[in-house]
Amino acid sequence: MFTVFLLVVLATTVVSFTSDRASDDRNTNDKASRLLSHVVRGCCGSYPNAACHPCSCKDRPSYCGQGR
């Protein structure tokens, strides 16, 4: 009976540990998405010499050759 108890405790610990790591990965992906969105927004005309595609900014049509 004690062996069954130890197996249940071990199984619970393993499941808890793996689900915690999975949620950490999701949080990392969310943070990366937010950082990338700030980079794209930052180079939409605010920095003329930025190394990004100017047409990624929807509200500045002159950067895409439409307003010239």
Curated annotation (Swiss-Prot):
Location(s) in or outside the cell: Secreted
UniProt-listed Pfam families: Toxin_14, Toxin_8
Any one Gene Ontology molecular-function term assigned to this protein's record: ion channel regulator activity
GO CC annotation, single: extracellular region
Domain notes: The cysteine framework is IV (CC-C-C-C-C).
Function, in words: Alpha-conotoxins act on postsynaptic membranes, they bind to the nicotinic acetylcholine receptors (nAChR) and thus inhibit them. This toxin has higher affinity for the adult subtype (alpha-1-beta-1-gamma-delta (CHRNA1-CHRNB1-CHRNG-CHRND) subunits) (IC(50)=2.3 nM) of the receptor than for the fetal subtype (alpha-1-beta-1-epsilon-delta (CHRNA1-CHRNB1-CHRND-CHRNE) subunits) (IC(50)=22 nM).
Stated family: Belongs to the conotoxin A superfamily.
Name of this protein: Alpha-conotoxin PIVA
Source organism of this protein record: Conus purpurascens
Lineage summary: Eukaryota, Metazoa, Spiralia, Lophotrochozoa, Mollusca
